[in-house]
């Protein structure tokens, strides 16, 4: 009788541990919606700043392709808080890299180069052809 009780108890404990592990995995999953919200926050932050003839523009690698490297480059005026922007972009890039692993994402693996020609058009930093 004790043996059956002990085995039953072990089975219950085992399943409880397995359930809590899968619950924690589910809560750590990154969604495409979360990435879109974070990207919009970054783009919105950048859009609050203007460039001019005296305020130049720069670019930062953004996103994470499944096979490595950035998906694109964001352009921004030099008046942004660069440390803040880098921090937000690095967080986003890390989340997207984690999302790629989590979803077994694939990409074209094409190397995206930083823009060579960035200019200020109507007070907005723009990649020029």
What are these regions (language model features)?
Residues 17-36:
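Bacterial Sec-dependent N-terminal signal peptides
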Residues 37-72:
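Post-signal-peptide N-terminal segment of Sec-exported extracytoplasmic proteins
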Residues 1-17:
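Sec-dependent bacterial lipoprotein signal peptides
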Residues 99-129:
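Short flanking/linker segments adjacent to small metal-binding domains or redox-active Cys/His motifs
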Residues 59-94:
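Mature extracytoplasmic domains of secretory-pathway proteins
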């Amino acid at each position: 009788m004790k043996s059956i009780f002990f085995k039953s108890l072990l089975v219950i404990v085992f399943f409880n541990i397995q359930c809590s592990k899968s619950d924690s995995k589910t809560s750590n999953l990154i969604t495409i919606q979360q990435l879109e919200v974070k990207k919009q926050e970054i783009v919105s932050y950048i859009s609050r700043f203007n460039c001019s003839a005296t305020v130049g523009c720069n670019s930062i690698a953004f996103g994470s392709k499944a096979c490595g490297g950035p998906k694109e480059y964001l352009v921004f005026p030099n008046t942004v808080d660069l440390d803040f922007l880098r921090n937000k972009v690095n967080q986003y890039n890390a989340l997207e890299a984690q999302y790629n692993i989590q979803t077994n994402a694939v990409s074209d693996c094409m190397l995206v180069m930083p823009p060579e020609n960035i200019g200020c058009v109507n007070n907005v930093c723009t990649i020029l052809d």
